[in-house]
């Protein structure tokens, strides 16, 4: 991903991908300025792990003011599936995802897994998110920071478990009032977290 380090991408118009064979951006480590524009009709039918509009966001990556809508579906034992990023080491700010995301483990509307250096701030989601475990309206597996985010997701799982792992979480002013079905390391904001979750709101359907 060295091509993107220090580079800035600016989105100046809305983009409709309904007629485009799009496979996701493999690696990105630059600045992506969405300008409040929408990339719509993203359709990813993937095999294997680590998939999203961006598969990997590096430590120096900053994605701001971007709206994405579409459907991301996976086959087999796929992990780290997200609407915006499969794996996030960077910063995702003021972004949103609307649509459908499904996978096996670590599945979220914004990111599948948010690594220790990852920051997801002031993001919004309105999606149906389905996985076997580690399922979240914002992030499936959070190891970093999730702050000031709002989820209006429907969270689903096909496997029942009676406990939830939230070890090490700083809940802050988290407000959870949403819809969660068959809890199995899943939640309206994050599925499982060893990081920080602060000032988030779940208004799930």
Q: What are the functions of these language-model segments?
A:
Residues 1-205:
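Surface-exposed repetitive/solenoidal architectures
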């Amino acid at each position: 991903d060295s091509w993107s380090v220090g580079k800035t991408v600016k989105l100046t118009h809305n983009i409709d991908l309904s007629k485009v064979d799009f496979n996701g951006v493999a690696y990105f480590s630059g600045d992506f300025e969405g300008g409040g524009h929408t990339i719509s009709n993203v359709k990813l039918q993937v095999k294997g792990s680590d998939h999203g509009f961006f598969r990997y966001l590096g430590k120096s990556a900053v994605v701001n003011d971007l709206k994405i809508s579409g459907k991301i579906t996976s086959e087999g034992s796929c992990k780290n599936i997200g609407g915006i990023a499969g794996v996030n080491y960077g910063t995702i700010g003021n972004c949103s995802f609307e649509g459908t995301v499904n996978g096996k483990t670590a599945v979220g509307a914004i990111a599948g897994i948010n690594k220790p250096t990852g920051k997801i701030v002031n993001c919004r989601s309105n999606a149906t998110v389905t996985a076997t475990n580690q399922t979240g309206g914002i992030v499936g597996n959070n190891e970093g920071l999730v702050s000031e985010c709002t989820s209006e997701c429907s969270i689903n799982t096909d496997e029942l478990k009676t406990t939830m792992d939230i070890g090490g979480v700083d809940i802050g002013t988290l407000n959870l009032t949403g819809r969660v079905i068959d809890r199995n390391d899943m939640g309206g904001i994050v599925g499982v977290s060893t990081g920080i979750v602060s000032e988030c709101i779940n208004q799930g359907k």
